[in-house]
Amino acid sequence: MHKFLALGLLPYLLGLLNSTRLTFIGNDESDTAIALTQIVRGLQQSSLAILALPSLALSDGVCQKERNVYLDDFLQRLHRSNYKSVVFSQTELFFQHIEENLQGANECISLILDEPNQLLNSLHDRHLGHRLSLFIFYWGARWPPSSRVIRFREPLRVVVVTRPRKKAFRIYYNQARPCSDSQLQLVNWYDGDNLGLQRIPLLPTALSVYANFKGRTFRVPVFHSPPWFWVTYCNNSFEEDEEFNSLDSIEKRKVRVTGGRDHRLLMLLSKHMNFRFKYIEAPGRTQGSMRSEDGKDSNDSFTGGIGLLQSGQADFFLGDVGLSWERRKAIEFSFFTLADSGAFATHAPRRLNEALAIMRPFKQDIWPHLILTIIFSGPIFYGIIALPYIWRRRWANSDVEHLGELYIHMTYLKEITPRLLKLKPRTVLSAHQMPHQLFQKCIWFTLRLFLKQSCNELHNGYRAKFLTIVYWIAATYVLADVYSAQLTSQFARPAREPPINTLQRLQAAMIHDGYRLYVEKESSSLEMLENGTELFRQLYALMRQQVINDPQGFFIDSVEAGIKLIAEGGEDKAVLGGRETLFFNVQQYGSNNFQLSQKLYTRYSAVAVQIGCPFLGSLNNVLMQLFESGILDKMTAAEYAKQYQEVEATRIYKGSVQAKNSEAYSRTESYDSTVISPLNLRMLQGAFIALGVGSLAAGVILLLEIVFIKLDQARLWMLCSRLQWIRYDRKV
């Protein structure tokens, strides 16, 4: 029995040995060159990189010479077909050439004239496996290498060319099936005695291969992030240990997803593309961030779900995964699933003090102009009335001079004096005299007119009447009506403080009012703060200054936790995140209690995949169809509507229960603050305060008048006493 078993295994072992060594047939150099030329032309590319190493397997000088001969012939035929080629004899230069093409997003085809097991590890270590790079291995073997010996793992694209007989070549491809085992499959062949290549193009396209995954199972990291994923964690699923990133440890930590927009999207994709998925818990329950600047080029430079993708332990990653330059170096993104914008949420603007409502109908910059207008209206009115009296005065030579009780007639003096007297002209008043205390009357008249008090006509002149009409129109239609309408509006709907809806206002609030800004840990919003410029950099510096003792003090586990923090009374707190995520979480606690800022910057969310993912094109096609048909927007709106219905049902239930106890009054009061409320005595506090201030000012002025009158009487008595003493001294 053992003899027959050994004889059965002998052909298999001989096949393995035969597949790993070079086998050349004499005088077949032109056949090999022709076949390789046809194979390369079947790829329909215009350039080719060739790696021809002085392999140790070619110890025989004849074999080495024969390979050089067919290589030269192959290059000549390739150049005749207008192909560009570059030949490398050193692996380092060859790898650098591949890296430069990948950095420029250029498709690169390489022909390696050596066995794959010598270069496979280097290709994986240097992350050269990509859907844009194709490696063609030909070393003259009759059979392809066994999957037990060599495994070509995704995303590495490999073509193995074998030569089972003379003028016959077989082409094996590792991505001919959508499964993840990457086994070599026969996809084409070349027959020199027939028509050459069996089919053109040489390889099946990735769109056709990965249009149907045929039940392939993908691992998807997930964590609780409404409205994208609603996750329920199992017992002790979040335990930090050193081996958390191992695949066995990750699969042991089970989670249960109960809903979410991206959960629905993933179910739709799995149904359309025929694959299955398995949720695993993302390390740290975060999207992931860069560990340090020193290890950014390593294979595990990111944490969280992005770190699982980078290390190849996961296939997809959804859940508002924002695009950024730092993340793009570690993973790739599909067509965007959400066009969003950055924003921050704070508490709703608080109601202002109702006692000062009488000052709010006009803005602060209007009150100075209004007060100056009222102050200068009196002097202007006085000038309009007094100018005619001033104009009617005339200069004339008076014949009679008054010197106390004496009357001097200038005509008589001219007659009795030999010399001529120089007479000075004097002002002669008109018959109509200026009213007594006209200036004070004008001041009080304008004040009573602007304050809508009853007042008599001050002057009969047409100029004064015209100005009185102008003042009355300004006081009635401009000031009184506008002020009354605004004040009525303020009483009907009490005013609130200015909202904090811009970065400038948020920065001022953090500096002057002690506001604290929170952000989800290891999120794209945190990367925007860390790597941003101008205001974002200043805000990040303020955040770090406010929590000097606790460097992680401004981190929150999720946006939902930040909104809950504000809802519980955090009136001096703000949360930065995606606007859609903020809006959804705000709906849970009542949109009237929060204030969303303006759109700060544009951000896109997409499905994250591994670098060089071979099925990214197929995934993009499906996502673009969903986006163009509006299905993505409908899914988002449906998730919002579902959550809104749940919130309304919860609110109605709580209202019916709390209406029977003492807390119903506080609920009603908080609700009444958002709608039009009737006038109450609290709103009229400002009028009584103004009355009290006016009464106090009047009392102070009266007291000052009494004091100054007494001082004037004392000074007059002292002056009279001095005059009496002076007269007495003169008489003596």
Swiss-Prot record:
One of its GO terms (molecular function) is ligand-gated monoatomic ion channel activity. Gene3D superfamilies: 1.10.287.70, Periplasmic binding protein-like II. Its main location: membrane. One of its GO terms (cellular component) is plasma membrane. Disruption phenotype: Response of sacculus neurons to changes in humidity is abolished and consequently larvae fail to move towards their preferred humidity. Keywords: Behavior, Cell membrane, Glycoprotein, Ion channel, Ion transport, Ligand-gated ion channel, Membrane, Receptor, Sensory transduction, Signal, Transmembrane, Transmembrane helix, Transport. It holds the Pfam family Lig_chan. It is a multi-pass membrane protein. The chain crosses the membrane at residues 370-390, 466-486, 689-709. In the antenna, detected in sacculus neurons which innervate the first and second chambers (at protein level). Glycans are attached at residues 18, 235, 299, 531. Residues 20-369, 487-688 are extracellular. Residues 391-465, 710-732 are cytoplasmic. It comes from the Eukaryota. It is found in: Cell membrane. InterPro entries: Insect_Ionotropic_Sensory_Rcpt, Iontro_rcpt_C. Residues 1-19 form the signal peptide. GO terms for biological process: detection of chemical stimulus involved in sensory perception. Integral part of a neural sensory system in the antenna that provides the neural basis for the response to environmental changes in humidity (hygrosensation). Together with Ir25a and Ir93a, mediates the response of the hygrosensory sacculus neurons to changes in relative humidity and is required for dry detection behavior. Belongs to the glutamate-gated ion channel (TC 1.A.10.1) family. This is Ionotropic receptor 40a. It comes from Drosophila melanogaster. The lineage of its organism: Eukaryota, Metazoa, Ecdysozoa, Arthropoda, Hexapoda. The gene is Ir40a.
